[in-house]
């Protein structure tokens, strides 16, 4: 495993730890998810370039499309939650709350 791969895996792990630690606010959770998706994109692109697997060239682009959709839905949810409740706490997403 090269140093580049280890750095990308460490970036993914740090984003995952950030998601687990700072999950009280929706904005910080969205930023950590974006970091995870970006590191997965770079890892997929490097893996495809190193293995010369031409059939999977579109996989990183598809991953970026899903990341953009996730970001758009997350930001729309953030705007809705902050307009409704006035805060961006993740605990406001619980539908069973009275």
Swiss-Prot record:
Coiled coil: none
GO MF annotation: an example: NADH dehydrogenase (ubiquinone) activity
Membrane-spanning parts: 1-21, 29-49, 61-81
Entry's EC annotation: 7.1.1.2
Source taxon at top rank: Eukaryota
Biological process according to GO: ATP synthesis coupled electron transport
Record-linked Pfam families: Oxidored_q2 (PF00420)
Record's catalysed reaction(s): a ubiquinone + NADH + 5 H(+)(in) = a ubiquinol + NAD(+) + 4 H(+)(out)
Subcellular localization: Mitochondrion inner membrane
Keyword annotations of the record: Electron transport, Membrane, Mitochondrion, Mitochondrion inner membrane, NAD, Respiratory chain, Translocase, Transmembrane, Transmembrane helix, Transport, Ubiquinone
Top-level class of the enzyme under EC nomenclature: translocase
Family to which the UniProt record says this protein belongs: Belongs to the complex I subunit 4L family.
Assembly mode: Core subunit of respiratory chain NADH dehydrogenase (Complex I) which is composed of 45 different subunits.
Protein name: NADH-ubiquinone oxidoreductase chain 4L
Organismal lineage: Eukaryota, Metazoa, Chordata, Craniata, Vertebrata
Designated gene of the protein: MT-ND4L
């Amino acid at each position: 495993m090269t140093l580049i791969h280890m750095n990308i895996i460490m970036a993914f792990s740090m984003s995952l730890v950030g998601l687990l630690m700072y999950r009280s606010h929706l904005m910080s959770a969205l930023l950590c998810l974006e970091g995870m998706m970006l590191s997965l994109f770079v890892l997929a692109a490097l893996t495809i370039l190193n293995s010369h697997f031409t059939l999977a060239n579109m996989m990183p682009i598809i991953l970026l499309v899903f990341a953009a959709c996730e970001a758009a839905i997350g930001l729309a949810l953030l705007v809705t939650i902050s307009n409704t409740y006035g805060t961006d706490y993740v605990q406001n997403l619980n539908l069973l709350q009275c």
